[in-house]
């Protein structure tokens, strides 16, 4: 029997506010444990929360950017459960009246557009963090994260594969970063993904029993976990078993999901309206004011790159997939007329060094090559000061040292040879040293010409102007 995978996501994104959702404590990441908290964060008796207006605005902005309806009236609710990192024994969240609902994000899979529904976006506070490796006798609790504002983005069960899920998450991450709603640093926990997954016979309309997967701290983990869990559930069904509705933990090292606990239902949390906070009232003027602050989003920027810069759709898609990459590219083309070359360098060498060093796209801001330096390198090639081959060598040194390309070219004597007489001598030497290749060329073997060009470049240490090498070499070969 052929099965279909059905996937829905719950994505938690930390909002980019400077202070927490119900108090003035900082949201800065990385402080000493329990130094960024106060009686409100830790739920001491007698304290009252005050809602951070900026958190609401960021949530509305996320809703507008994902085509959601914005609720004019919503409220906050207490979600009751016990866990050591939850000092109040309840989390302030939203239950039946979320701030944003009925949205969507369009993605492209194998050249086909697909719409993924956003069921709701609601605001809530984060819990603390358990530290398991700092005390031999047990676990410790760090309350710094308590009260950090989150949005939870809940999708409809519209995703059908790990690939669709990855593409959707990359698009969502880009939208949140473009709008400034969240920095989405997964390594710092500011973007966390829970995956709800079930399988059903292909063609069936009924949903299977779902499991929820947690501890997914990278998109690669999400993809691997989906592929493993789908296979596991299919094997259970085909062996006559029953899939248990439960929460499962992804074990990155072993590449498997492990049972954590049975899956809770809403009634298990005994939700009730938060008595210490008034309802959230949002009027049209406030929504329009926030809408005006939304910058150009990835899809809009992609269309502009295609129309304004004449870039291929694929290139435009890659360059706009991350706000940091797009900003780097736009800064680069302020200093060079050759937009296509800038795109090629970004798509080729820049992406390569990010991938080779395991850097996220947003970490492009930390590399030593500045956008204006990349533009200078492009200009050196365009004005024939250096060849493309030499430019790649210069690029590597720029990445390691941060030096300007002009400085590297001067220090290493890499200026392109354009003197015809010098190139002619190198051509004659290459011809004299490789009679077999000359004979092959005369017999119609085109590859022999490429080999001879390579020999000339080797003699000139890659510094000869390639166009002149081709021209002079052909002239000399015709004389033979």
UniProtKB/Swiss-Prot annotation:
What Pfam families does UniProt report for this protein, alphabetically? Answer: GatB_N (PF02934), GatB_Yqey (PF02637)
Q: What is its EC number?
A: 6.3.5.-
Q: Which InterPro entries match?
A: Asn/Gln-tRNA_amidoTrfase_suB/E, Asn/Gln-tRNA_Trfase_suB/E_cat, Asn/Gln_amidotransferase, Asn/Gln_tRNA_amidoTrase-B-like, GatB, GatB_C_1, GatB_Yqey_C_2, Gln-tRNA_amidoTrfase_suB_CS
The entry assigns this protein to a family as follows: Belongs to the GatB/GatE family. GatB subfamily.
UniProt name for this protein? Aspartyl/glutamyl-tRNA(Asn/Gln) amidotransferase subunit B
Q: How does it assemble?
A: Heterotrimer of A, B and C subunits.
Family annotation (SUPFAM superfamilies):
GatB/YqeY motif, Glutamine synthetase/guanido kinase
Organism listed in the record: Caldicellulosiruptor saccharolyticus (strain ATCC 43494 / DSM 8903 / Tp8T 6331)
GO BP annotations, alphabetical order: glutaminyl-tRNAGln biosynthesis via transamidation; translation
* Catalyzed chemical reaction(s): L-glutamyl-tRNA(Gln) + L-glutamine + ATP + H2O = L-glutaminyl-tRNA(Gln) + L-glutamate + ADP + phosphate + H(+); L-aspartyl-tRNA(Asn) + L-glutamine + ATP + H2O = L-asparaginyl-tRNA(Asn) + L-glutamate + ADP + phosphate + 2 H(+)
Q: What is the lineage of its organism?
A: Bacteria, Bacillati, Bacillota, Bacillota incertae sedis, Caldicellulosiruptorales
Q: Keywords, A to Z?
A: ATP-binding, Ligase, Nucleotide-binding, Protein biosynthesis
As for what it does, the entry says:
Allows the formation of correctly charged Asn-tRNA(Asn) or Gln-tRNA(Gln) through the transamidation of misacylated Asp-tRNA(Asn) or Glu-tRNA(Gln) in organisms which lack either or both of asparaginyl-tRNA or glutaminyl-tRNA synthetases. The reaction takes place in the presence of glutamine and ATP through an activated phospho-Asp-tRNA(Asn) or phospho-Glu-tRNA(Gln).
The protein's matches in Gene3D superfamilies, at most eight in alphabetical order, are given as:
1.10.10.410, GatB domain, N-terminal subdomain
Class of enzymatic activity (EC top level): ligase
Gene name linked to the record: gatB
Domain of life, per lineage: Bacteria
Task: Give the transmembrane region(s).
Answer: none
Q: Which GO molecular function, any one, fits this protein according to its record?
A: ATP binding
């Amino acid at each position: 029997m052929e099965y279909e995978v059905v996937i829905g996501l719950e994505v938690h994104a930390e909002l980019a506010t400077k202070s927490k959702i119900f108090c003035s404590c900082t949201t800065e990441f990385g402080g000493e444990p329990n130094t960024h908290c106060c009686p409100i964060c830790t739920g001491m008796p007698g304290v009252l929360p005050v809602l951070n207006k900026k958190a609401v605005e960021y949530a509305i902005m996320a809703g507008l950017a994902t085509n959601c309806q914005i609720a004019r009236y919503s409220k906050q609710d207490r979600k009751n459960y016990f866990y050591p990192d939850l000092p109040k024994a309840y989390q302030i969240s939203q239950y039946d009246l979320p701030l944003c609902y009925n949205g969507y994000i369009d993605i492209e899979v194998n050249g086909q557009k697909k719409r993924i529904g956003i069921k709701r976006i609601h605001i809530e506070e984060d819990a603390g963090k358990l530290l398991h490796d700092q005390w031999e006798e047990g676990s410790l609790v760090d309350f710094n994260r308590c009260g950090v504002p989150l949005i939870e983005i809940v999708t409809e069960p519209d995703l059908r594969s790990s690939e669709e899920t990855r593409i959707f998450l990359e698009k969502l991450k880009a939208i949140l970063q473009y709008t400034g709603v969240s920095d989405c640093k997964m390594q710092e926990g500011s973007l966390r993904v829970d995956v709800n997954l079930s399988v059903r016979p292909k063609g069936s309309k009924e949903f299977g029993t779902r499991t929820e997967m947690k501890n997914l701290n990278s998109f690669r983990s999400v993809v691997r976990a989906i592929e493993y869990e789908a296979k596991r559930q299919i094997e259970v069904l085909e062996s006559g078993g029953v899939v248990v509705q439960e929460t499962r933990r992804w074990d990155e090292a072993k590449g498997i999901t492990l049972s954590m606990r049975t899956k809770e239902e809403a009634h298990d949390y005994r939700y009730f309206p938060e008595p210490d906070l008034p309802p959230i009232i949002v009027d049209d003027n406030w929504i329009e004011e926030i809408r005006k602050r939304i910058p150009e989003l990835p899809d809009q920027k992609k269309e502009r790159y295609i129309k304004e810069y004449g870039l291929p759709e694929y290139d435009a898609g890659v360059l706009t997939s991350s706000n940091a990459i797009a900003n780097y590219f736009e800064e680069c083309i302020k200093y060079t007329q050759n937009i296509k070359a800038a795109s090629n360098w970004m798509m080729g060498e820049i992406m390569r060094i990010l991938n080779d060093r395991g850097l996220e796209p947003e970490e492009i801001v930390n590399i030593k090559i500045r956008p204006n330096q990349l533009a200078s390198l492009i200009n050196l090639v365009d004005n024939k000061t250096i060849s493309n081959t030499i430019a790649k060598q210069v690029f590597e040194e720029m990445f390691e040292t941060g030096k300007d390309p002009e400085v590297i070219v001067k220090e290493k004597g890499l200026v392109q040879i354009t003197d015809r007489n010098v190139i002619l001598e190198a051509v004659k030497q290459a011809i004299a040293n490789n009679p077999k290749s000359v004979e092959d060329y005369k017999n119609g073997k085109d590859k022999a010409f490429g080999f001879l060009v390579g020999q000339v470049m080797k003699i000139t240490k890659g510094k000869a102007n390639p166009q002149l090498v081709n021209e002079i070499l052909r002239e000399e070969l015709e004389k033979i």
